[in-house]
């Protein structure tokens, strides 16, 4: 613990909070006085060091050796702690890498600067030049010879965010959360590393990164409700994309045999701990592969992300260990139901009337047009999905719920499709792609019929995509990985809002 922390902190957010409006008014008066003295927000200081690199390089150096070297440093950051003691003071400065303590004396910085410093507040952004030394307690610190105020903070920082009462504030004012919570900062640094590792993995396997439209004339590529907007110049109703799939497959038709995209999808659906209407997905397509190749490849990609974020393929999520280094289990939908809900017989699982009655017990009202495969999938979602804690591929999805996937040669009622579940959540969805234009057109027509029967998540008919397939698409495998859910897993975050910098919120007023 630093010397600044050992003493009573001069902190507006003490146990007895003053009226925030009063504090803001006081700070505005201070800013007014600073403006009258000259440049209130200077921009001519350039830090030469960051806190963490100084700790890494000099924490282990003995005090005498450090003093003899007289190492000059220049740092800048936000003042998080402050302790004034007559003619000498300590403060803690936080930059992008961490925190370091500074030591200020009237003798070293001059009377005018020292008197000004005493009026500065927590949250102010300051700059300091000086030399490194160790305090009596062994704390690496900067003995300041030059001190400047770069930005006056008008709002007091909270002492901390604590408990569920402040959860909404954390999401709504993420900028404050990032200032005061090291855990939050670590989460989003890890997210950046995960995305970078996935991108590097894809590029190392000769995939081409592309960007496809966010505004679609016809929504497609997934079963979901779209957001609708209007293109004024074209006087055209358009849809925020729910998936990039159909455009990426057009690129495979065009000869880009390995493509991927990391970008946003938008689905006009509910909010939950695992759903945000705006979310990040990586989709990739590889010609001359199938769903079995994809499963092996997806495993390797997720392991690479885990090692980048956690340093190991063995991670902990919500107090339980997960080994992403072991081969992932593979089960059919029926196999998963029988494993996790063994009370059901094969005969019952093949009886549509029974399945409809059983689903009612879970509060699921199955639409009349749903066939056996869709009913089996619905029962799987109610009985087995949440129990798939360890990485598990659910394979062989019914054709009727997989309108873009290739049917199995051995059983045309199922497709060469998988979904990957970890901790009871879907992380990835992939399949051998349907490249038969006539079969795809027939499935689109079936989706249109389902939409007319009341299924508002069924797909539209996309004539241009059919035209693309008619030019010929090679045998192809494709997969989508939910980046947000993967980041949740690898950062031990219980809610998707914890891994999205600015999640959707209701208006404050």
UniProtKB/Swiss-Prot annotation:
GO terms for biological process: lysyl-tRNA aminoacylation. Gene3D superfamilies: Bira Bifunctional Protein, Domain 2 (3.30.930.10), Nucleic acid-binding proteins (2.40.50.140). Its cofactor is Mg(2+). It is an enzyme of class 6 (ligase). Mg(2+) 1 binds at residues 419, 426. Mg(2+) 2 binds at residue 426. Its main location: cytoplasm. It catalyses: tRNA(Lys) + L-lysine + ATP = L-lysyl-tRNA(Lys) + AMP + diphosphate. One of its GO terms (molecular function) is lysine-tRNA ligase activity. CDD domains: LysRS_core (cd00775), LysRS_N (cd04322). It is found in: Cytoplasm. Its EC number is 6.1.1.6. One of its GO terms (cellular component) is cytosol. Keywords: Aminoacyl-tRNA synthetase, ATP-binding, Cytoplasm, Ligase, Magnesium, Metal-binding, Nucleotide-binding, Protein biosynthesis. Binds 3 Mg(2+) ions per subunit. The keyword Transport does not apply. Pfam families: tRNA-synt_2, tRNA_anti-codon. Belongs to the class-II aminoacyl-tRNA synthetase family. Homodimer. NCBIfam families: lysS_bact (TIGR00499), PRK00484.1 (NF001756). This is Lysine--tRNA ligase. It comes from Methylobacillus flagellatus (strain ATCC 51484 / DSM 6875 / VKM B-1610 / KT).
């Amino acid at each position: 613990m630093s010397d600044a922390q050992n003493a009573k902190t001069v902190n507006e957010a003490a146990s007895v909070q003053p009226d925030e409006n009063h504090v803001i008014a006081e700070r505005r008066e201070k800013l007014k006085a600073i403006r009258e003295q000259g440049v209130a927000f200077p921009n001519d200081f350039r830090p030469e060091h960051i806190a963490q690199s100084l700790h890494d390089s000099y924490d282990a150096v003995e005090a005498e050796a450090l003093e003899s070297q007289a190492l000059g440093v220049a740092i800048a950051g936000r003042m998080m702690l402050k302790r004034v003691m007559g003619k000498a003071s300590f403060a803690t400065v936080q930059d992008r890498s961490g925190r370091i303590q500074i030591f200020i004396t009237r003798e070293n910085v001059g009377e005018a600067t020292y008197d000004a410093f005493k009026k500065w507040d927590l949250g102010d952004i300051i700059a300091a030049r000086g030399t490194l030394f160790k305090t009596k307690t062994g704390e690496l610190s900067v003995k300041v010879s030059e001190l400047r105020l770069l930005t006056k903070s008008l709002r007091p920082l909270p002492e901390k965010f604590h408990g569920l009462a402040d959860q909404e504030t954390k999401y709504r004012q993420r900028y404050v959360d990032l200032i005061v919570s090291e855990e939050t900062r670590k989460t989003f640094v890890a997210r950046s590393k995960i995305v970078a590792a996935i991108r590097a993995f894809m590029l190392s396997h000769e995939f081409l990164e592309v960007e496809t439209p966010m505004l679609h004339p016809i929504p497609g590529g997934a079963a979901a409700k779209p957001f609708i907007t209007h293109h004024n110049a074209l006087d055209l109703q358009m849809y925020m994309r729910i998936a990039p799939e159909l455009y990426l497959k057009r690129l495979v038709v065009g000869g880009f045999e390995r493509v991927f995209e990391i970008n946003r999808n938008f689905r006009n659906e509910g909010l939950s701990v695992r759903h945000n209407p705006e979310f990040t997905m990586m989709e990739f397509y590889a010609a001359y592969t199938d769903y079995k190749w994809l499963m092996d490849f997806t495993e390797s990609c997720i392991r690479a992300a885990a090692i980048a974020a956690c340093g190991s393929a063995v991670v902990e999520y919500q107090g339980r260990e997960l080994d992403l280094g072991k081969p992932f289990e593979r089960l059919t939908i029926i196999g998963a139901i029988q494993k996790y809900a063994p009370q059901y017989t094969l005969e019952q699982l093949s009886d549509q009337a029974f399945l409809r009655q059983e689903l009612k017990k879970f509060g699921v009202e199955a639409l009349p047009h749903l066939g056996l495969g869709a009913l089996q999938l619905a029962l799987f979602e109610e009985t087995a999905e949440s129990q798939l804690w360890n990485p598990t591929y659910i394979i062989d999805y019914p054709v009727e719920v997989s309108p873009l996937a290739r049917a199995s040669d051995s059983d045309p009622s199922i497709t060469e499709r998988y979904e990957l579940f970890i901790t009871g959540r879907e992380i990835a969805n992939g399949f051998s792609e349907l490249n038969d234009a006539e079969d795809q057109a027939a499935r689109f027509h079936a989706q249109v019929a389902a939409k007319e029967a009341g299924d508002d998540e069924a797909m539209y008919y996309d004539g241009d995509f059919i035209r693309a397939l008619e030019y010929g698409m090679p045998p192809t495998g494709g997969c989508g990985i939910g980046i947000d859910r993967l980041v949740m897993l690898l950062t031990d975050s219980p809610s998707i809002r914890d891994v999205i910098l600015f999640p959707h919120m209701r208006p404050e007023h």
